Amino acid sequence: MKTAIFTVVLALAVFAVLSFGWEANEKALSEEFTELIHEKEAASETEARGCRYFWGECHDHMPCCDWLVCRYKWPITYNICVWNRTFPEK
């Protein structure tokens, strides 16, 4: 009986250690992913864009790309660029 209880306690201790290690690894991966997203976001902000892309917010001073048109779509409260059913010429 003592052996069975000792085995159960030992198994619980092993599971606790493994789950703690897994949680620490998961947190490190989450931090790396967040840093990667911030780097990509910063890189895309530095690019100069001449037009707004699909589902991008548009106004007179922010035109859509050639194959898109600026439309008001409910329930969105601002104008967005939507496809005008044409394809861009290459």
Swiss-Prot record:
The keyword Secreted applies. Expressed by the venom gland. Disulfide bonds join 51-65, 58-70, 64-81. Keywords: Disulfide bond, Ion channel impairing toxin, Knottin, Secreted, Signal, Toxin. It is found in: Secreted. Ion channel inhibitor. Belongs to the neurotoxin 10 (Hwtx-1) family. 13 (Hntx-13) subfamily. This is U7-theraphotoxin-Hhn1f.
